[in-house]
Amino acid sequence: MKIIQFVAPLVLLAALTNAQAADGLVAVKSPYSAKVTMDRFELIVKEKGLNVFARIDHAAGAAKVGKALRPTEVLIFGNPQGGTPFMECAQSVGIDLPLKTLVWQDASSQVWLGYNDPMYLAQRHGVADCPAAENLGKALAGFAAAAVAPKPVTP
């Protein structure tokens, strides 16, 4: 347990150091392929008891219409326990829920894991002081950090 208490903040710090936030999008570099990154993220959210509603492979969709797209996948997930308190602050937040994570490979072959910053969403909906946004932000940062961490994620 002491090891987890020591390692977890370091992993989170490393992930946040690599995070970029522009227009509310938090993007974290991944050392894994896009598929492996999304597989890891999906496993983590399922282990945390969240519902996975859909996993959308945009590259596969593009291929169906004769277009080429680098690996790009979206995971749609959530849980009323997290989303409802956010919507209690402003029901309009429902347009941005369930939560989504995007994993993509850029033109330089770097893989990224990105998500909308709940604090940005709270500001967008006029409830910047909503505690649920901060809680969701911490959870998403933790999930992202674990997904890109150099340790095994096992079912």
Kindly label every feature range from the protein language model.
Residues 14-17:
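N-terminal signal peptide c-region/cleavage motif recognized by signal peptidases
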Residues 118-155:
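C-terminal partner/receptor-binding element of secreted or periplasmic proteins
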Residues 31-36, 53, 130-134:
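Soluble non-cytosolic domains of exported or imported proteins
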Residues 37, 41, 58, 136-139:
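Stable alpha-helical elements in mature extracytoplasmic
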Residues 21-49, 145, 149-155:
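Terminal, regulation- and interaction-focused segments at domain boundaries
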Residues 100-130:
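Beta-strand/loop substructures that line and gate deep hydrophobic ligand-binding cavities in soluble
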Residues 42, 46, 53-99, 103:
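Compact, glycine-rich, soluble single-domain proteins
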Residues 1-8:
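Bacterial N-terminal signal peptides that target proteins for export
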